[in-house]
Amino acid sequence: MKDYLRHIWYWICKYPLSLLPNNIFFNLQYNIVCLRHGYKHRWLNINNPRRFNEKIHWLKLNPCIKDGEFLADKYRVREYIKNTIGEKYLIPLIGVWDKVDDIELAKLPNKFVLKANHGSGMNIICKDKSQIDWNKAKNKMRFWLKNSQYCLSREWQYKDTPRKIICEQFLKDDITDYKFFCFNGRPKYIQVDIDRFKCHRRSFFTDKWESAPFTTLYEQPEKMPEKPTQLEEMLGVATKLAKDYAFARIDLYIHENKVYFGEITLHPEGGCGIFI
């Protein structure tokens, strides 16, 4: 059902809504999200931004990162990670393909993760190869390659990305996700996501691991996450990766006491995240 609704929304964005100027499209999209969650909607002041989402939308309208297309590409960004913080932070890559039919299931390990390189929310997590519906998976990946994330959110960094499917090593089930919100190269807040695919809980901390003065519509965990022993290392990694940018969110994981790079996000949730 979720995929079906995504297809409908993509068609709406690609055709009738494509006629709207960016400012109106952004406000329509933001208010649809607000209404869907029963949250008070408001008109975004993009020209004179004061709130976080307004500033994210300003950055969408005013690209100021010369290599943003490179950073947003989940395949090409690996070279930046290798050169900036070292190859040890990369999740092992199993394969990369331009065409879905070139992917041979028999040659993949029993557990793996398939992703599109040119957007967000396009993942297939396989924990047992014998249980995967491969035809369904291939149809989903064909849809990914056929369509552009730019149509959904008008994020400029996705507009001309060469589309590929990548396969990475599966780390573990329900791995904790640490997302570092970096302003002018400095990590200020940390979003922690737990049990994303079962009972998703989210909490926010400062860089000192103190509770942040805001949250989102996601419920917070009953027991707040403990400060990870690798926090200082992760803060250092986030600082190095975000040092040249007005804003970037650096996503990291911890697996078997090792820090791994997830992705660099320039416009979290397309500027439509709801903070309370």
Where does each model-flagged region fall?
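Phosphate-binding site of ATP-dependent enzymes
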Residues: L108, S130, W134-Y218
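Short, flexible loop/turn elements at secondary-structure junctions
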Residues: W97, H118, Q169-L171, C182-N184, ...
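Protein kinase-like catalytic core scaffold
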Residues: F112, K188, A248, Y260-G262
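A long amphipathic alpha-helix within ATP-dependent nucleotide-binding catalytic cores
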Residues: D160, K164, R202-V259
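A short, polar/proline- and glycine-enriched secondary-structure boundary/capping micro-motif
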Residues: I125-C126, C199-F205, G271-F275
